[in-house]
Design a protein with these regions (language model features):
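Substrate-binding/active-site clefts of carbohydrate-active enzymes
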Residues: 18, 24-30, 38-288, 309-320, ...
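Conserved, mostly hydrophobic/aromatic
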Residues: 35, 104, 114, 135, ...
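Active-site-proximal helices and loops of the catalytic beta/alpha 8
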Residues: 7, 152, 156, 170, ...
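Active-site clefts of carbohydrate-active enzymes
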Residues: 391-417
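Short, well-ordered beta-strand segments enriched in hydrophobic/aromatic residues
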Residues: 542-549
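C-terminal beta-strand-rich structural cap/linker in extracellular carbohydrate-active enzymes
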Residues: 31, 586-614
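Short acidic/polar active-site loop segments enriched in Thr and Asp
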Residues: 110, 291, 438
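Active-site rim elements
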Residues: 18-19, 84-90, 267-269, 294-297, ...
Length: 614
């Protein structure tokens, strides 16, 4: 039974005789995987490996093959249906996701970040989950509360943490204004709460189910504590997204802004609404044994509200034995904004730092100066922080995502371009083996190539359905033989084995073509085709990693290594290369006024070298 009111929650039974899954000691050791639940798995796939590694033969959807590309575009009607399907519910479920823990575990994923799962307004196709109507229930498209509990239990059995995407800033389109056009800043009268069809037929106040039985479960807003005008700011929709206080008070399009309280960050007075939100998200931690939250749209909340919420949640999680419950904030903008927001609010990590995706993706493709990416993580007067201490567990890094909010213009996954598939492994490896908590966006390991004029093209279905990647339909993509999946799994296994690759300091290394003249790799003209090496150092260990931005031929370069850690004649051994024949080969440390080694990196390839011991 789903409670209609917070007063009905039985906190004693939620915590009695339970041992909760402990937090990881270090989140920088984890590899995150972000998935949109509606687009991930419906559980009907055939020919994939189950959680134990056995081939499933009972499904109905076959595995995608290259010959299936474009099978949805054979007729104009088929193309139209494919595009339209991208804006609707497709059928991914919690049960389907539960069957893919083996797929994720074998890839090297240690934590999943799941898009919002809570009950949505019933008259919109809000498959993305950001339009909540009942904060205490799971949307029936996704399954049930028990399905969530089973998912988390299974994930924990496979050593995978579960982070839920949550919303504090707004609810779904749960009421209608009297006016048709309601731009901020207004003080707009409300017609009523919306019924299951979207009509504002329910009085705007505490719901009497005897008079309005249609309000449960699909009308108004739940739990009942939210059924008061004071829950909402009611000032109309945002037009100027960077205008203060418009971006704090305004509705997010049709999504209704919630009123959190008032006051400065040090003297913030939470509203009843914010107190209720705290209770709701405490409930989900206890009910399902959740390990972390990703907070949506932190920019649109007062920092005092964010800090109050973070404090309450961290305290509650500690009572359950989750001493490192992680709160990741979507903090758009640059590094300085991320730093100040984290320092002031008590959030644990920032996601959405604007510079990272662009500089990472285009470095790999050869169109950004390598130092533009690596200097993002350097000791900086801007941050007044020692970089390797701060960035290692304070920033979640990724290059593909579900909305590309900071990029503007058209939407495109990394592999949408002509050569993206050639070097996507390099992008995934660069993300995994540099500072920060790496996050993989679902489908990147299968070279998803969506692009277009809206977010839907970034949200193809892994299980195929009517909106698969490569303009396909009814073909799934859980292919563990895909070369990118297979090679990334090897790289992530090495990352898991090598503490230095997870926690070490990092330095972009100077290179030389002749062994005499050394300098940092840099773009000349419009592009760079070169070895790009960097070192990770922890205590007295150095591991050298390098990629090649030349798509067509191997590149060789002398690469500087730490002068004090290595002696002339010492050897580095290749522990990974996209050219398997290089693995276990060695190179010698030479003195050419600097200590250096000569590395050859395959075309569009990637290598990892460590000192040969003994």
């Amino acid at each position: 039974m789903v409670e209609k009111s917070l007063a009905e929650l039985n906190w004693e039974s939620l915590r009695a005789n339970r041992k909760f899954f402990p937090s990881p000691n270090a989140w920088e050791d984890q590899v995150l995987y972000f998935l949109m639940l509606d687009r991930f798995s419906d559980g009907n796939e055939n020919g994939y490996k189950d959680n134990e590694g056995q081939i499933v033969k009972s499904g109905t959807t076959p595995l995608f093959t290259p010959g299936d590309a474009g099978n949805a575009f054979k007729t104009p009607e088929g193309e139209h249906k494919w595009r339209e399907s991208g804006d609707r519910w497709l059928g991914g479920t919690l049960k389907g996701l539960t069957t893919k823990m083996g797929y994720l575990k074998r890839l090297g994923v240690t934590a999943i970040w799941v898009s919002p799962i809570f009950k949505q307004v019933s008259f919109y196709d809000s498959y993305h989950g950001y339009g909540i109507q009942n904060f205490l229930d799971i949307d029936p498209h996704f399954g049930s509360r028990e399905d969530l509990k089973k998912l988390v239990e299974t994930a924990h059995q496979y050593g995978i943490y579960v982070i839920l995407d949550i919303i504090l800033n707004h609810a779904g389109n749960v009421f209608s204004y009297e006016a048709d056009d309601t731009p901020w800043p207004g003080s707009y009268p409300v017609k009523g709460f919306n019924d299951p069809t979207g009509k504002p037929s329910i009085p705007f106040g505490p719901v009497d189910l005897n008079k309005n039985p249609e309000a449960w479960p699909n009308g108004a807003i739940w739990p009942a504590e939210f059924q008061t005008p004071a829950t909402f700011t009611r000032k109309g929709y945002i037009r100027n997204w960077d205008n203060y206080p418009e971006y704090l008070e305004g509705d997010f399009f049709s999504l209704k802004d919630l009123y959190h309280g008032t006051g400065s960050i040090d003297d913030y007075q939470p509203s009843p609404t914010l107190l209720h939100l705290c209770e709701i998200y405490k409930f989900w931690i206890a009910y399902a044994d959740i390990d972390g939250y990703r907070l949506d749209t932190v920019k649109h909340m007062e920092k005092g509200a964010t800090r109050f919420f973070a404090s309450v949640i961290h305290e509650f999680a500690q009572v359950l034995g989750k001493d490192n419950f992680y709160l990741i904030g979507e903090i758009t903008g640059g590094r300085l904004n991320a730093y100040t927001t984290l320092e002031e609010t008590g959030l644990d990590a920032a996601l959405g730092i604007s510079e990272i995706p662009d500089k990472l993706a285009y470095l790999v493709k050869g169109y950004r100066d390598p130092n533009d990416y690596f200097r993002l993580f350097r000791n900086s007067l801007l941050l007044q922080k020692e970089s390797h201490v701060w960035f290692k567990n304070k920033v979640v890094t990724m290059f593909d995502d579900h909305d590309q909010a900071e990029r503007g213009g058209g939407k495109a996954r990394f592999c949408a371009g002509e050569k993206g598939e050639k070097v996507v492994l390099n992008a995934l490896a660069l993300n995994a083996l540099t500072l920060g908590i790496p996050c993989i966006y679902y489908g990147s390991e299968q070279c998803f190539n969506g692009s277009g004029d809206s977010d839907r093209y970034l949200r193809e279905a892994m299980f195929g359905g009517e909106f698969g990647s490569y303009q396909s339909r009814q073909r799934h993509f859980f292919n563990e033989e895909n070369p990118v999946y297979r090679e990334l799994a090897k790289i992530l296994e090495i990352r898991q084995e090598k503490l230095t690759l997870r926690r070490g300091r990092q330095y972009l290394r100077p290179i030389s073509g002749n062994g005499v003249d050394f300098g940092l790799p840099q773009i000349i003209g419009d592009e760079i085709r070169s070895v790009v090496p960097w070192s990770r150092l922890l205590d007295r260990e150095e591991i050298v990693v390098a990629l090649n931005t030349d798509y067509n031929q191997p590149r060789t370069a002398w690469v500087v290594v730490d002068y004090n850690l290595h002696q002339v004649g010492d050897r580095f051994q290749c522990i990974y290369s996209t050219d398997r024949t290089q693995v276990e080969t060695t190179v010698v440390v030479e003195d050419r006024n600097v200590k250096c080694i000569s590395l050859t990196v395959p075309a569009a390839g990637f290598v990892i070298y460590e000192p040969l011991k003994g």
